[in-house]
Amino acid sequence: MNIKSSQTLVSEALKEIKTINTDEALTLFNEDKCNLIDIREKGELDKMGRVENSNHIPRGMLEFWLDPDGPYFKSGKLDMNKEMVLFCAGGLRSALAARSLKEMGFEIIK
């Protein structure tokens, strides 16, 4: 069995998505041009805090909550016409999540 490493998956994702820095993400968010999505787990939010007015969608639920045809879709939670800016603690999970949403058809900025 040949298993890809998580680092390989992240490296591949980073080749397919656009990344921006924190200042660029906050500028887009403050100008109301994107949905700022925190994909960290609840325990991380409790420990490290959160960006005010950002949307919290845990990584494990992201695709389910954003699938309009799925039973877990969170209608009205996000403006589905805006770009999705995802962030986590270190950028690895958000890279994989951005790639997944890109595959679903979303316009993504990490």
Q: Over which residues does each language-model region extend?
A:
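Catalytic cysteine-centered active loop of the rhodanese-like fold, especially the PTP/DSP P-loop
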Residues: 70-110
